[in-house]
């Protein structure tokens, strides 16, 4: 084929809805591009849009980009994707520009410091396991919004594209995490993060995530993975990711030195109270990637963490471990269904209730912890 060009259209969605209106179009039928021997070509075009509405978790203004491959006036192929207009940055801030009068390295969305009030979330359903419906995804987002949760860490893998669509639409700040976890090798010399033969796999998993998801405005942090060692393979993965997308900061809890921000897991309240002052030898801004482990009668001291974190801007926030119990349905001898966990199926060995850490039950009913989180957040 020859004499092909692309027509771009930009639509603005109504807030929290999918109906939209045309904002702008761009079509340059005279632009010339040469394809390679495989018939491929990369085309970069710029469309300037005035008076855009910014995307935030409170006002998630979503735009839809439609690209049409044209031959003359004939449409050969069409693609579309969601996007949004918002900035994410980490910058050194003088005391005169900080609401608390403290100079520091802070995290900003659309030029304003933001607190990420979050949860870690796994895909789970007590009947279908790791396969969940779109209806469940939306119900979970609604429950989160009602509990003042504005942030999710996609522990520990990228989610279904529809989940990102929902987070774009309803307003959730995402830390999108690559599907890398190898802590059975622990963090010493045996860690796969050090092994050269696994370097390509580390890079591939990070870049596959980025290539698929880069246009989603809800993603405000990339994560290189979870508990997978501190080695050089993650340095290469970070460099590859930043070369592709420099618009978002990158987090990796197992090696803060190689990424853009600090993070840890399960710090004490006493440590947090000291660290938020900005004088500790850690990388700022800081995000607690896992805290407030919610097994059993838990989350009672969440307010103590947040009184500390909200006293300065050195901490961006954190993500509770975790959102939903990873239970499965089982049945009594009488045929009564119940939410079961390790050991209830006659399995030996087992981890007992160790996946029952959610602030909601596996059937999406809120626990008492849910209401505590709602109050504090």
Question: What is each model feature region?
Answer:
Residues 141-144, 151-361:
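Substrate-binding/catalytic cleft of secreted carbohydrate-active enzymes
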Residues 1-160, 166, 170-171, 205, ...:
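Secreted/periplasmic carbohydrate-active enzymes, especially glycoside hydrolases
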């Amino acid at each position: 084929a020859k004499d092909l060009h692309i027509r771009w259209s930009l639509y603005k969605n109504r807030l929290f809805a999918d109906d939209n209106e045309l904002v702008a179009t761009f079509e340059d039928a005279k632009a010339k591009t040469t394809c390679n021997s495989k018939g491929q070509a990369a085309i970069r075009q710029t469309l300037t849009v005035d008076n855009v509405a910014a995307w935030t978790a409170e006002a998630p203004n979503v735009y839809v980009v439609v690209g049409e491959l044209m031959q003359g006036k004939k449409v050969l192929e069409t693609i579309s994707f969601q996007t949004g207009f918002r900035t994410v940055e980490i910058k050194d801030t003088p005391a005169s520009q900080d609401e608390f009068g403290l100079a520091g390295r802070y995290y900003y969305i659309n030029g304003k410091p933001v607190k990420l009030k979050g949860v870690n979330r796994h895909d789970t359903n007590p009947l279908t396991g790791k396969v969940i419906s779109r209806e469940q995804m939306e119900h979970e987002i609604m429950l989160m919004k009602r509990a003042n949760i504005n942030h999710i860490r996609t522990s520990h893998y990228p989610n279904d594209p529809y989940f990102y669509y929902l987070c774009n639409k309803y307003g959730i700040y995402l830390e999108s995490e690559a599907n890398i976890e190898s802590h059975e090798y622990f963090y010493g010399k045996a860690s796969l993060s050090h092994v050269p033969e696994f370097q390509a796999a580390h890079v591939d998993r990070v870049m596959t995530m980025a290539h698929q998801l880069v246009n989603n405005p809800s993603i405000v942090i990339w994560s290189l993975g979870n508990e997978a060692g501190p080695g050089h393979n993650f340095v290469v993965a970070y460099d590859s990711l930043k070369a592709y997308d420099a618009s978002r900061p990158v987090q990796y809890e197992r090696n803060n030195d190689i990424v853009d921000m600090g993070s840890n897991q399960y710090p004490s309240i006493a440590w947090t109270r000291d660290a938020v002052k900005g004088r500790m030898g850690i990388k700022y801004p800081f995000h607690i990637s896992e805290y407030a482990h919610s097994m059993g009668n838990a989350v009672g001291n969440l307010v103590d963490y947040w009184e500390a974190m909200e006293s300065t801007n050195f901490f961006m926030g954190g993500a509770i471990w975790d959102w939903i119990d990873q239970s499965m349905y089982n049945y009594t001898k009488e045929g009564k269904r119940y939410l079961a966990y390790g050991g209830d199926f006659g399995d030996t060995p087992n981890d007992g209730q160790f996946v029952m850490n959610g602030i909601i039950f596996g059937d999406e009913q809120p626990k008492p912890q849910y209401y505590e989180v709602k109050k504090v957040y």
